């Protein structure tokens, strides 16, 4: 599997489909934002070959050269997005899902009408600048994984039931059904209304909050790409502790001024210690002291029906490889698993089998990285849950499936 080296670059091009006029170009190098721009001749050639295929009723989706993978995607016959990656072995699935998230981010900020009925290109360029911070986070080495899995990044708080009860009461007091508590862009707790949000906004909204500079409070207009792409809503955020924010998705009411400190103190002051215990959960995802095998270097757990996931590389963080490498390896392993071994989500036959045979034998695959590294990656699926583990070299290969199955059973009550 490919690994991002220091020289790997990702370029993202956005063009008006009808005219080919570039709306923006964003780049990253080695996982960090970069000012490197592609020459206009290259941009024109990439768009030209795509348009040439369309004129011949040929859909050009992707292409590979010796050192670059290219993916094209047209949205609503109005916006063309092109992704180029020099990461060794990068998959089309990864780039295609990134393009879907980028377009979702554009709709989230400016609305679908502005993108499908472009009246003034220069004005649209200016409006899209507000989405750059969010878009750039998809190009870099994020600690989140929802952009790839299309599942909401979650954490498990130590006192989840108390947190959920307080959140529901606060939502009722403020008169909105869509409320969540976020830490570092991950959902700690949310109301039923928030969980019913469709994709991609269910992933994009926490990701947006995590990408914005810290503020005590915000009143941010957003469109919902799935639920309300042409009529804006208000995203209100309130910082309880640094890195821990309340989010409310609402209409004209309530005004931000009504969410005064007294209201917050009444609901959240009694939970001050549980709230503080949530702060380390950003990178860790699991409560402190949760029993995990010492050989586990990282894990990704997905609930394929609820569209939620847990992602952490914190276990045994004093061992090699680095947390950044672990995240990249698990992301790459997920793309391999999703495209080769397991379908993205259960089909009707599998769901029927879940009902008829509740006690299933997990489906599994594993990969040993080498030479010289020896890190082991294993995936096991049981019903609606898929678990990916990264394990240290000393883990015996014959014990991978058993370790993964026991870990999945231990994590199942959490997600």
UniProtKB/Swiss-Prot annotation:
One of its GO terms (molecular function) is phosphatidylinositol binding. One of its GO terms (biological process) is negative regulation of cell population proliferation. Keywords: Cell projection, Cilium biogenesis/degradation, Cytoplasm, Cytoskeleton, Developmental protein, Protein transport, Transport. Probable planar cell polarity effector involved in cilium biogenesis. Proposed to function as core component of the CPLANE (ciliogenesis and planar polarity effectors) complex involved in the recruitment of peripheral IFT-A proteins to basal bodies. May regulate protein and membrane transport to the cilium. May regulate the morphogenesis of hair follicles which depends on functional primary cilia. Binds phosphatidylinositol 3-phosphate with highest affinity, followed by phosphatidylinositol 4-phosphate and phosphatidylinositol 5-phosphate. GO terms for cellular component: cell projection; cytoplasm; cytoskeleton. Belongs to the fuzzy family. The keyword Transport applies. Component of the CPLANE (ciliogenesis and planar polarity effectors) complex, composed of INTU, FUZ and WDPCP. Interacts with CPLANE1 and CPLANE2. It comes from Rattus norvegicus. It is found in: Cytoplasm; Cytoplasm, Cytoskeleton; Cytoplasm, Cytoskeleton, Cilium basal body. It holds the Pfam family Fuz_longin_1. This is Protein fuzzy homolog. CDD domains: Fuzzy. It comes from the Eukaryota.
């Amino acid at each position: 599997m490919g690994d991002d080296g220091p020289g790997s670059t990702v370029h993202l091009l956005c063009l008006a489909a009808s005219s080919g006029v570039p709306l923006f170009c964003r780049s990253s190098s080695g996982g960090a934002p970069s000012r490197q721009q592609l020459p206009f001749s290259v941009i024109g050639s990439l768009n030209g070959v795509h348009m040439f295929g369309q004129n011949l009723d040929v859909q050009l989706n992707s292409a590979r050269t010796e050192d670059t993978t290219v993916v094209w995607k047209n949205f609503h016959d109005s916006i063309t997005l092109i992704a180029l990656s020099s990461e060794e072995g990068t998959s089309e699935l990864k780039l295609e899902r990134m393009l879907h998230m980028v377009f979702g981010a554009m709709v989230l900020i400016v609305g679908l009408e502005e993108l499908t009925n472009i009246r003034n290109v220069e004005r649209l360029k200016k409006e899209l600048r507000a989405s750059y911070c969010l878009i750039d986070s998809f190009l870099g080495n994020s600690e989140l994984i929802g952009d790839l899995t299309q599942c909401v990044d979650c954490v498990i708080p130590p006192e989840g039931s108390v947190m959920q009860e307080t959140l529901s009461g606060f939502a009722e007091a403020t008169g909105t059904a869509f409320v969540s508590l976020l830490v570092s862009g991950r959902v700690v707790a949310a109301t039923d209304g928030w969980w019913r949000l469709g994709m991609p906004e269910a992933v994009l909204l926490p990701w947006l909050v995590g990408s914005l500079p810290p503020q005590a409070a915000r009143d941010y207009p957003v469109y919902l790409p799935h639920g309300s792409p042409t009529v804006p809503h208000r995203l209100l955020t309130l910082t309880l502790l640094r890195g821990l924010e309340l989010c409310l998705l609402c209409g004209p009411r309530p005004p931000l001024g009504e969410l005064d400190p007294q209201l917050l103190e009444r609901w959240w002051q009694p939970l001050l210690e549980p709230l503080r215990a949530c702060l380390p959960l950003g990178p860790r995802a699991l409560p402190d002291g949760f029993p995990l095998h010492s050989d586990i270097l990282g894990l990704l757990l997905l609930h394929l029906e609820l569209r939620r996931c847990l992602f952490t590389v914190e276990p045994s963080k004093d061992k090699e490889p680095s947390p950044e490498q672990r995240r990249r390896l698990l992301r790459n392993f997920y793309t391999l698993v999703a495209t080769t071994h397991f379908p993205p989500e259960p089909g009707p036959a599998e769901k029927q089998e879940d009902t008829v045979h509740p006690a299933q034998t997990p489906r599994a695959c594993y990969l040993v990285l080498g030479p010289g590294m020896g890190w082991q990656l294993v995936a096991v699926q049981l019903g609606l849950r898929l678990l990916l583990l990264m394990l240290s070299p000393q883990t015996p290969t014959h014990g991978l499936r058993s370790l993964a199955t026991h870990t999945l059973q231990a994590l199942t009550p959490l997600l």
